[in-house]
Amino acid sequence: MTTAPVSPLQAVVTANHDAISDDPAKAAVVFRAEARAHSAVASTVALGRFEIEVDEPPALGGENTAPPNPPVEYYLASLLSCQVVTYRVWADKLGIAVDGITARAEGDLDVRGFFGFDDAVRAGFGEVRVVVTLTGPESRERYLELQEAVDAHCPVLDLTRNATPVRTVVETP
């Protein structure tokens, strides 16, 4: 008997499905990050065993010491990288062939909200635009079907489209 080859992503999805089916508590995952401030507005952020540097451009009080500069660009990077992962996983799940994925994003931010110059202006992006280019043998309709699945399942996109409760606690010695 010949079995169809299983892609690495299919194997990951299947393993997670099986583990979660056996114990639904395994579906709950906690991600962590920890930041330490230094310089004027720069910080070092620990993500597991990795560290990244975050800074702002001089116009926002920073020293331009780390690419990308503003933390909002890290948000764009997070959104795009999550989109790429989600496109790969869902292309595999739906049996849609994708040869290449490129994505770009830009967001409009009015700094009056950040600096508190105008309380009617939100502090974050007013709009984010994402363009994903897919190459491969499938029809446009199949790729639009894939986009619908990605839009419904991309965790970082979900954070933006749906209000996520954030609880902040200030600790002092």
Say what each PLM segment does.
Residues 1-77, 89-173:
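Extended beta-strand/beta-hairpin segments
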Residues 79-83:
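Alpha-helical metal-binding/catalytic segments enriched in His/Glu/Asp
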